[in-house]
Regions:
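Short beta-strand/turn micro-motifs composed of small residues
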Residues: 15, 37, 138, 163, ...
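A Rossmann-like FAD-binding core segment of flavoenzymes
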Residues: 74-77, 81-88, 95, 155-253, ...
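FAD-site-proximal beta/loop scaffold in flavoenzymes
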Residues: 114-132, 216-220, 224-286, 290, ...
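Short strand-loop-helix active-site module centered on a catalytic nucleophile
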Residues: 134-149
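Glycine-rich active-site loop/strand segments that organize a redox cofactor
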Residues: 36-54, 58, 103-127, 325-326, ...
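FAD-binding core/adjacent interface of flavoenzyme oxidoreductases
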Residues: 1-12, 70-135, 211, 222-224
Length: 368
């Protein structure tokens, strides 16, 4: 590390999601860290569907950046350009860096403040409570998990899930998809595969038309489909030639952007051949933090830690007590994988990784 008489190296982290928040927290005492994020908080994104049915859960999962980044600067803005040694933000801040970490993930229009985000969940929850019938569009992990949360917490609701693919959960294997489908059907969720929904033409009576010519009656809908990568702004930057044809930054085994010695990319924005999952993004963050510390210590690039793409492991929650899990050699469903993920959704661990307590009120920690 730098000697006491030396100024610390400047590390700028773009994006305060699963990856960006952890790398900023990890480096805050060894480097001069600046986190640039359009929102004032970090969110445990895989828990937001539970927060939709239980808004108070958000008190633990929506966390102000300042709660974990106590020794760094926070700029609530978006990056609009990057040069060899500076980042330019939407409000015309010019932020110099010695090391840059691009962790901008996906672009999702969310509120800027924690209070606004928690209020959003209250409104979504009220939307569910007020509806007798609900349409979920999208059968990836978000759509399946939302259907599971509503089916368990609000079993009286009529639920329909429409997915354009031939099976659910296409990012993992067909065995896991079949188990999820069977669970949804057993919990009275109507699943329509191989169809899409035209959300631009919904009748006043709540009639939705599918691409197969079917109609669905629903009082409200939730859109659970993919959102674009947060890389469009890079197309006019020095990194424009480092984007692949899908808009992902190409990185080497050290998570350095190819052709650069001081710019890292982590999380969903990378071209690493693996499923884009939060726990893997956090592994990226720890490897990158280690490598930046090594570089600040004067180590050669040959000494840097390498990242191996993650294997096809996934756990998809099915309500509060069950889940479907895919491991390298087995796929299981039910209460066993549910105990691994579904009860707490790894919230306590994720908070601990950022130096925070569980966030559970003390009265709930006591034995009954």
């Amino acid at each position: 590390m730098a000697n006491c008489g030396e100024s610390k190296k400047r590390v700028v982290v773009l994006g305060g999601g699963m990856a960006g928040s952890l790398v900023a927290k990890t480096l805050q005492y060894s480097a001069d860290v600046t986190l640039i994020d359009p929102k004032e908080y970090f969110e445990i994104t895989w828990a937001n569907l539970r927060t939709t049915v239980e808004p108070s859960f958000g008190e633990r999962t929506v966390i102000n950046h300042r709660d974990y980044l106590v020794n760094g600067r926070i700029l609530t803005s978006s990056a609009t350009n990057v040069t060899e040694n500076e980042v330019v933000t939407a409000d015309d801040h010019v932020v110099p860096y010695d090391y840059l970490v691009v962790a901008t993930g996906h672009v999702e229009p969310v509120p800027q403040t924690r209070t606004e985000r928690l209020n959003h969940y209250q409104k979504e929850n009220q939307k569910i409570k007020s509806a007798k019938s609900i349409l979920i569009v999208g059968g990836g992990p978000s759509g399946v998990e939302l259907a599971g949360e509503i089916a368990v917490d609000f079993p009286d609701k009529k639920l329909t899930l429409v997915h354009k693919g031939s099976r659910l959960l296409e990012f993992i294997g067909p065995k896991a998809a079949d188990k999820a489908l069977n669970w949804l059907k057993a919990h009275r969720v109507e699943v329509k595969l191989g169809q899409s929904v035209d959300l631009r033409n919904v009748s006043d009576e709540g009639t939705y038309a599918t691409s197969a010519g079917e109609t669905i009656q629903a009082d409200c809908h939730f859109l659970c489909i993919g959102i674009p990568l947060g890389s469009a702004w890079l197309r006019e930057s020095i990194l424009k030639d480092k984007l692949d044809n899908r808009g992902r930054l190409m990185v080497d085994e050290n998570l350095l952007v190819k052709g650069h010695k001081n710019i890292f990319a982590i999380g969903d924005i990378t071209d690493i051949p693996e499923a884009k999952q939060g726990y893997l993004a956090q592994k990226h963050a720890l490897v990158t933090a280690k490598n930046i510390n090594l570089l600040m210590d004067g180590q050669k690039e040959s000494k840097l830690a390498t990242y191996q793409p993650g294997s096809a492991i996934a756990i998809v929650s099915l309500g509060r007590k069950e889940a479907v899990a895919q491991f390298p050699f087995v796929t299981i469903s039910g209460c066993i994988p549910g105990k691994i993920k579904s009860k707490d959704l790894f919230v306590t661990k994720t908070r601990k990784d950022r130096g925070l307590d569980s966030g559970i009120p003390s009265s709930k920690n006591k034995c009954s």
